Amino acid sequence: MSFYREVSSLKQILCLSNEPWSTSPGRTQQLLSRLRDTQILYFAPPAGRRDRSFRQKGQKVRPNVTVYTLPPTLFPVSEQYSRLFLRNQRKLGRFIADKAARHRFQSPLLWTTSPEQVHLLDHLEYDGLVYDCDRDWEELPPLWEGALANNADIVFAASPLLADRLSPCSSNIAQLPNGVNYPMFSGEGGSIQSDPLPQVHGPVLGWAVVIHRELDLSPILYAARERPGWTFLLLGRQEDNPLLPRLRRQPNVALAGPCPLNEVPDWLFRCDVLLELLREDRPDSDVISGRLYEYLSTGKPIVSMLWPEQVEIFPDVVYGAHDEREFLTLCQHALEEAPGFVSQRRQSYGAAAAWSLRAAAVSRSLDTAGLL
């Protein structure tokens, strides 16, 4: 009985995530795993229509966190087919409610991450609603996100533009930028272990994250052709990007593929300059990526591509280029940067974005709102 009282005294959180629980944690996992005195049921989206993970038992990934995979919708139905659409939402709601009941969840805080989840609100019991917005959901009906933000007790927004867009729908919006595992990427505690490119002796300029189809790789292709003595590293999972075949033919381009998260810092510290590129499908986004905070945490020089009228990001420590020629010129300047010139300032920006500090800000906001 005393154990039950101890468990019930913890704040219970139902998390509807838009990303799986992973060894390479995303925003939701980074934040919730750091909230203290909580008991969390984390519902991850299915990997596809044939994903049967929902039939498995919940996976206890932390002493206070249990992960379930939601059942897939075999035949996605548009909202205009109201009866079938509602049936799908009821199915998901029953699944979540059943798991919550098994874990003795009563009046939990509901943490949402996608406008699609607004349709589950009528099928779940909760006491307090959070909407964490980390992107522009332009592919979804605006009314969905508006309704979710309007119902939420507090909205977290990853950038000023996202906060402005949601301001007509909520009077309680807190800006919460992305963050970084600062100890890992700053090299604290001797986390840098080996040289992943022992055979390369010239300058190395690197990009480290998923190579999305929409990623504009033209600046790297241009620079690789102009500077054959430089090595350009592309680290991460590769999608069907139209410029990848041409980059593969460049002898000074290294396509390293994906690697475990704990090995990424070794690759970044092997680079002389780190590169931030643009995604053509996100021309209006002002969300600062977690990748940039990882770069800053290393203290290494950074060259970032910018949209024509984009406000420069961290202009005192990041070189901002607007075209391929300027990109090449600034890469040269970055290579010539005096050691330690602004590296400590870069790392101070990374330290200020540590996920531990972001989670502490979430806790304060929830406590102020009476939700935690």
Feature-to-residue mapping (PLM):
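Nucleotide-sugar-dependent
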Residues: 22-26, 215, 262, 267, ...
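Membrane-proximal helix-turn-helix segments that form the acceptor-binding/catalytic region
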Residues: 97-98, 136-157, 162-166
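Carbohydrate-associated surface elements
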Residues: 161, 179, 188
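Conserved donor-binding/catalytic core segment of Leloir-type glycosyltransferases
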Residues: 196-215, 220-224, 235
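Glycosyltransferase donor-sugar binding loop
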Residues: 232-242
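Nucleotide-activated donor-binding/catalytic signature segment of Leloir-type glycosyltransferases, i.e.
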Residues: 242-266
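Conserved acidic donor-binding segment of nucleotide-sugar-dependent glycosyltransferases
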Residues: 317-325, 333-339
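A charged, aromatic-enriched C-terminal amphipathic alpha-helix characteristic of glycosyltransferases
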Residues: 339-372
